[in-house]
């Protein structure tokens, strides 16, 4: 705990002392739990299995239960749940029966934000990276923010941290429209794309209106930071009745990038800002999508008065986020090695951005993708887009869809995706049976100099470390921490 934090007004939730998280190991839950622990609250939580995340929280004083049972919630003053938790969960049912409040995670995050200068990052893609860049730049500027991020910040070794300043930087989740609970001082919209459409009853106009509603949670003196390159963000811009700053590659943007040069993992560019000197910037991430994430960060940092030196330092010193084009190391193959990358991208737009980044940074190298679709409903709704974008790999291995609690949907599985991609005639995908070991399947396909990406939001995230430890890749070299 940080001693100087005493000077900062803290959430005082009346009679609430013990806070119980149902699904505490989830990426959106554990960060809030960690901040509350550091604020002195009693925290307990349950999850289906123990993990490094739950072990970390336990080391900080949280009481962790493996499995969901009614008695786990018996002594709680409030339950925090994510949208992934079934209302029939025994802990939730017990809390409702005993009139213990049950609140969504975003409502608890909003309570933390209510006492601070909140910076909320929304958008279909780029939230985690942008939030992480903001935390890095604010720290470089001496502002020591509290942050809650949807991925593990490499430099901090965690996805949440209690800071000593008035700033709280967090992701704003549109997937279940829970970002409407938040009332930040600054809000970013990186882009708006068709995803989680069941929340919006399949109505894209409803999704757009919800983003506008979110921005109108800003006070009249707040700031909306919006990506002008995204056509949907540009479309809703006239509807936003709050002060705005735009960013992008567009010449009309208030903050824009020119002279972009990518050299492997590094991207260099010049930033033009109204009434400011041009700024030369480098980030240790490939791709124009990450330039846009950096521009959003620069827009907010400039508005908050952070010096150019701190902005440059915070961006160049940024060490990345877990599973966002995370380089694990080099796998030995005949004649050389293969660069192994782990990535969370699970939407066609995200897959396309990663492929473009690889082609830009390593134009002569083959791209081998092991991809796992996430949710049958997303695969169905974006089927043609997946066929188009995945067909741009040089070699493609498709794992079966990660269901995330959904029942299979006919025609929306990986076998069908393989068939449709094969029909395009560009490449012949390999279907990976559920539970099959990857190393013996992928090794014969690899050539020296290849880039191998394990991509998706499901259990594909465990494959990169498995490959590094596989006897078939004895002598694999771990990526050194920057």
UniProtKB/Swiss-Prot annotation:
It comes from the Bacteria. GO terms for biological process: cell division; cell wall organization; peptidoglycan biosynthetic process; regulation of cell shape. It catalyses: UDP-N-acetyl-alpha-D-muramate + L-alanine + ATP = UDP-N-acetyl-alpha-D-muramoyl-L-alanine + ADP + phosphate + H(+). Pathway: Cell wall biogenesis; peptidoglycan biosynthesis. PANTHER family: UDP-N-ACETYLMURAMATE--L-ALANINE LIGASE, UDP-N-ACETYLMURAMATE--L-ALANINE LIGASE-RELATED. Belongs to the MurCDEF family. Cell wall formation. This is UDP-N-acetylmuramate--L-alanine ligase. The lineage of its organism: Bacteria, Pseudomonadati, Pseudomonadota, Gammaproteobacteria, Pseudomonadales.
């Amino acid at each position: 705990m940080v001693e100087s934090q005493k000077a900062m007004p803290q959430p005082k939730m009346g009679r609430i002392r013990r806070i119980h998280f149902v699904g505490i190991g989830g990426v959106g839950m554990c960060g809030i739990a960690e901040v509350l622990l550091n604020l002195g609250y009693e925290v307990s939580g349950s999850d289906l299995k123990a993990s490094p995340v739950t072990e970390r929280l336990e080391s900080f004083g949280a009481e962790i239960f493996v499995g969901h049972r009614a008695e786990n919630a018996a002594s709680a003053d409030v339950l925090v749940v994510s949208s992934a938790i079934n209302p029939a969960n025994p802990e939730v049912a017990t809390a409702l029966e005993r009139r213990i409040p049950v609140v969504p995670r975003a409502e608890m995050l909003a309570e933390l934000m209510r006492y601070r200068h909140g910076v909320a990052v929304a958008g279909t893609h780029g939230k985690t990276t942008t939030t992480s860049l903001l935390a890095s730049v604010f720290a470089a500027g001496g502002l020591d923010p509290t942050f809650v991020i949807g991925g593990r910040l490499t430099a901090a070794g965690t996805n949440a941290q209690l800071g000593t300043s008035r700033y709280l930087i967090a992701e704003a989740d549109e997937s279940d429209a829970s970002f409407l609970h938040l009332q930040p001082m600054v809000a970013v919209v990186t882009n708006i794309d068709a995803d989680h459409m069941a929340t919006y009853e399949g109505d894209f106009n409803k999704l757009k209106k919800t983003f506008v509603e979110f921005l109108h949670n800003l006070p009249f003196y707040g700031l909306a930071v919006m990506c002008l390159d995204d056509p949907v963000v540009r479309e809703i811009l006239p509807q936003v009745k709050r002060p705005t700053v735009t960013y992008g590659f567009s010449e009309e943007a208030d903050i824009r990038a020119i002279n972009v040069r990518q050299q492997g993992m590094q991207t260099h560019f010049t930033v033009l800002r109204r009434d400011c000197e041009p700024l030369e910037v480098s980030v240790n991430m490939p791709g124009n999508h990450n330039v846009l994430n950096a521009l959003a960060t620069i827009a907010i940092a400039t508005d908050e008065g952070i010096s150019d030196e701190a902005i440059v330092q915070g961006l160049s010193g940024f060490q990345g986020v877990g599973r966002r084009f995370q380089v694990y190391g080099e796998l030995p193959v005949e004649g050389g090695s293969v660069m192994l990358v782990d990535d969370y991208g699970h939407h066609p737009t995200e897959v396309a951005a990663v492929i473009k980044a690889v082609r830009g940074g390593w134009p002569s190298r083959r791209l081998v993708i092991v991809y796992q679709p996430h949710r049958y409903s997303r695969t169905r709704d974006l089927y043609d887009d997946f066929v188009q974008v995945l067909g741009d790999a040089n070699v493609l291995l498709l794992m079966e869809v990660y269901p995330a609690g959904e029942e299979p949907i006919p025609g929306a599985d990986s076998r069908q995706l393989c068939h449709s991609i094969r029909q395009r005639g560009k490449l012949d995908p390999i279907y990976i049976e559920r539970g099959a070991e990857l190393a013996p399947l992928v090794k014969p396909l690899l050539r020296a100099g290849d880039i191998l990406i394990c991509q998706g939001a499901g259990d594909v995230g465990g494959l990169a470390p498995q490959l590094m430890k596989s006897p078939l890749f004895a002598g694999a070299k771990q990526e050194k921490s920057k």
